[in-house]
């Protein structure tokens, strides 16, 4: 069937900010879809609230709107643009829920706008628990015994009848939000109450637990002619009970018989046909390991995290195909872009193994509960490809960037065999390392299987890795064992550890013995047809399929898995660097390990190496490709950390030299630059011992800001106010040494601001100054940023501009640099310099219309800014105001304290733009899912230091008609100032307390700045958690409250008595 001619304009809805459960995979799928529709000649309008995406670049669609994904704003865009159709299935759960809401509001019918790809009835049948259950019963497909509950009592009745444990699955939520496994009555009451609160339709499915069954996923495609195929089958290493986003996953399935695969494949095809979905679907199933009995767990009627993984695992671009199918093309009409010859109706075939491991944020959040369940906690994931499972598994392990190169780098010596075996359940993020340690101790595969229900096939693969470790340690220097270990994925560093050598020595032995990797192509057809894809992975075999181009090449290092502090912003910069390299006439090569991102779409670069970002793996590619140079500035700390070892191996690092990169990170060298330029800077010292740190802090005077050197996202950064707090920090957060000093600075109270600088060593251009709303002490990644500045004096802006330009020149910056300031007593103090692309690059690029990463890459390749039409200085701003706001995922991590501080906690960002600051702020709050009430009750519970400032804010709320509530200390202070206030008791004292008020929906806003306290049961912490659980706007910084009040005041009319 040819593509539809009756539609011309299509609106694509993006997925919004990155949160746990919905990450960069939707930037990848949305970008693919928009480009795919443009390729077919359609006029594409794109709306998304996330500025850190490739998807929101001007060239991706004909019109791009960075606006809140709310009904109000989408309706405005629909009325203005009048598209013929909406494609909602590529924007994750956000896109689907928006389509449903627009339809129910009657907007689609009124404007005669059609939904493409998936009809609303199919969305409802898959997402509404009751309709899904009815459909499965009609199809005679088995689902676990269950009941749809709209009250806690209904949930409890089911469990009392069918027994515990039960699984709670809320309807229309993301990443298992609000769900869980309840083993007791009280757990069920708590989980179901929370799930009902978070479900937009107040509905949860309570089902008999089938935890322990094998979890299998199928990615399925269907077109309007009812042609359907399975793109990929994937098997979870973890049995049912761990959210698939937190599961280790292999592709293709590893432990099923052909009969089992065909049985479940048939069921998947039957379901997509029954739903009449035109596009892609993810179907999750559970298989009883003891029989041929299976259950359908869930159907996602959209492109998902798993489909991004399946696309990268097979090379089959699901989102691109789904977009073409949505406009009427059929699978037998679409060419498979990987082969360039076969049609899209051919099911991909794999002659390799893919291994995905999630990346969790527990290195950032020491207090978080590391146990895994049905609610997702991972921020990102890595994928690795190998010729056998051991190879793929070990490549994935070293891709995680958690300081390990193999399974023997993380051991649990402090635990007995019994304690370690017991710690395996419930599953934790480090279970793979626990299993290896148990096997090393001689605990049997059968014992571990009985405890975890992980298939013995997978456990045997881990056991094989442990056996190879043992063999290596008794055959030091043996090349035969070395080759066998390399074929099974062992890193040089792991082998070096077992041989008592350095990784460089092992590398030399390997090269001397000609034990070198070859590169195989990912071609979707298991080499059955000729292929033209430039997508490769390393393995230790004979035939190399990657041929070095005659054209000079440049390698760009990606940023690895998405984690807090290093998000999709760096992938954005990586993709732009590739475009600039290609336009300059070079071959652009990407190395990355993240299956969710645009950079690992093989059509972006001239060559893609899906490999770990370690020194060994990068050098192997460099040995083959012999590039002109390597770009490290866009890969976050991952790539920057490789700069020096790469240079030591003779690699040409493009842009700022390694010596100058190190000068920015080395405290004494950097201080020297600051002194030479006579720039104001907070008093700071370096310490390499605990006593040295105490002496430094006492000399500077408390409070001090303390942090390790070489970090990203403020990891292990704190403000401490006494010797006791400092000693606690030194024991808990860092291992201090000569090689790893800590930096101690005077903590200056003041507003923060920052600039990105583009420099070629002679000309330094500042695209804009970003002013933070929160004062110093809140990490810049967690602050709201405003461009252009609204409150900074001209004197301060001039000081910042001059300081940044002088720093760029003094540091010999070639490319990008980020400079952060604190404004104290109307003077700009330099607090940090990052000699690389920062997380603000996408935002400042969008609002100034300057492709900074591309310009920086051109500079690295030798172009001069003067020749591009730039001169040194600050570029003037236009009349619009833009706000970048952080997004947090605290609902997924209830054990993490939401009080903001110098350690970064946000997972994503949104942008609000308008003609005035209050309007831009309003959009930013709406895009952040912060309700902006017109009136209601506001709770104040603030630290002593904040009480005077809180009075003014409370008066402003009171003038708007809000009723004031407070905890006892804050309330007494308000009463002294004659403010009308209702005082709530301490939580332990009575039911008239803040948490109860939040649970009963009596409070509309919570302002809580009571200091962090490691006790999870402290009142401040419990109030913060209750606000998050009940979706009540929570503010932990008074500056943000003031900005929120600016919005409320701008939207309200004054009512005054006549004088």
Swiss-Prot record:
The EC number(s) this enzyme carries: 6.3.4.16, 6.3.5.5
Cofactor: how and how many bound: Binds 4 Mg(2+) or Mn(2+) ions per subunit.
Residues annotated as domain MGS-like: 930-1059
Cofactor section: Mg(2+); Mn(2+)
Entry-linked PROSITE patterns: ATP_GRASP, CPSASE_1, CPSASE_2, MGS
GO cellular component: cytoplasm
Pathway: Amino-acid biosynthesis; L-arginine biosynthesis; carbamoyl phosphate from bicarbonate: step 1/1; Pyrimidine metabolism; UMP biosynthesis via de novo pathway; (S)-dihydroorotate from bicarbonate: step 1/3
Location of region: Carboxyphosphate synthetic domain: 1-401
Binding-site list for Mg(2+) 1: 284, 298
Entry binding sites for Mg(2+) 2: 298, 300
Residue positions binding Mg(2+) 4: 832, 834
Location of region: Oligomerization domain: 402-546
Chain positions covered by the region annotation Carbamoyl phosphate synthetic domain: 547-929
Subunit: Composed of two chains; the small (or glutamine) chain promotes the hydrolysis of glutamine to ammonia, which is used by the large (or ammonia) chain to synthesize carbamoyl phosphate. Tetramer of heterodimers (alpha,beta)4.
Domain notes: The large subunit is composed of 2 ATP-grasp domains that are involved in binding the 2 ATP molecules needed for carbamoyl phosphate synthesis. The N-terminal ATP-grasp domain (referred to as the carboxyphosphate synthetic component) catalyzes the ATP-dependent phosphorylation of hydrogencarbonate to carboxyphosphate and the subsequent nucleophilic attack by ammonia to form a carbamate intermediate.
The protein's name: Carbamoyl phosphate synthase large chain
Protein's organism: Leuconostoc citreum (strain KM20)
